[in-house]
Every structure is written in C-alpha cells, then in structure tokens.
C-alpha cells in the first residue's frame, strides 16, 4: 500500500530520510512536490495535492530535522 497525500507524517519522514542534507526551510513547494512524487512508495495522483497538504508535510519534515 503506497503513500497518499493524506499521509503527511509518513511523507515528511520519508523526505527527511531521502534528503538528509537538505534544510527543509529552504525548499520550494514546487521542488518538494516533485520529490514527493518521486518517492518509491508514493502512489497517488500528483495533481491531487494543494498548498495545505504541502504545508502539513513540510511541518513534519521540519520537526524531523530539528
């Protein structure tokens, strides 16, 4: 079962694991969207995201990075 846009915690943790040297505070949503869609376990419609979803994922990633 793949990751969906609603899995913000799991996606944020996966981004932290996949990009350990990236400071999430410097990431643009457009880049983050591409990285999420490229995650091996991601299995959802790339067009189904929105700013609120990306913000939730970013907050998890920031939390993991601290």
From Swiss-Prot:
Q: Which Pfam families match?
A: Fe-S_assembly
Which domain of life does the UniProt lineage start with?
Bacteria
Q: Which Gene3D superfamilies match?
A: IscX-like (1.10.10.600)
Q: Which GO terms of the molecular function aspect are on file?
A: ferrous iron binding
* SUPFAM superfamilies reported for this sequence: IscX-like
Name a single GO cellular component: cytosol
What the entry lists under InterPro entries is as follows: ISC_FeS_clus_asmbl_IscsX, IscX-like_sf
What GO biological process terms does the UniProt entry carry, in alphabetical order? iron-sulfur cluster assembly
Positions of transmembrane segments = none
The family note in this entry says:
Belongs to the IscX family.
Give the protein's function: May function as iron donor in the assembly of iron-sulfur clusters.
Summarize the subunit comment. Monomer.
Stated name of the protein: Protein IscX
Query: Which organism does this sequence originate in?
Result: Escherichia coli O6:H1 (strain CFT073 / ATCC 700928 / UPEC)
